[in-house]
Amino acid sequence: NMTVIPWTNADHFTCNEKFQGEFEVTLEIPAGGPYRIDTSLETKSTVPDLTWLYRGDCVLHLGVGNLFIIAGQSNSAGYSRDFCIDPPSMDVHLYRNRSKWDIASHPMNESTFARSLANEEMGVPGVSPYLAFGKTYGKMTGMPVGLIQTSLGGSPMERWNPKDGDLYLNMVDKIHETGG
């Protein structure tokens, strides 16, 4: 472990008398990772020169690198039923259908705990080439890779229509959810 960015003061906005509120800070994090971000609240004590730090939230396995959208049909969705040895890597993360980042692993288009969504598979997905792509690209660039899953096996082209296709609109929603 090493400190990349030291403790940084944030602007805070207290919303009510229960001290519930928000804080905002902009950090310049160098490409790479995985990083961990810790937050805490510093308060003054009644004893001079003594402060208390209250635990805040912690974000684990944060990578700053390249993002790719997985969109398309069978291969993108993982319809290969072949057995393969393709273990996960800490350098490749996947924005899963449940709208959470996770370490990328097969099956990549699984929908456990997902809300109803356009690209939910009816069958059990298998192996996708995109984990191997992410690992290879990450090794070539030396940077983490994030994959955003939006594919659906056997989907017709009209569902990808930018004007009103539900799969296209789902893809745009996922891009917005991840900060794009």
Task: For each feature predicted by the language model, list its residue ranges.
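Cell-envelope and extracellular/periplasmic
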Residues: N1-G180
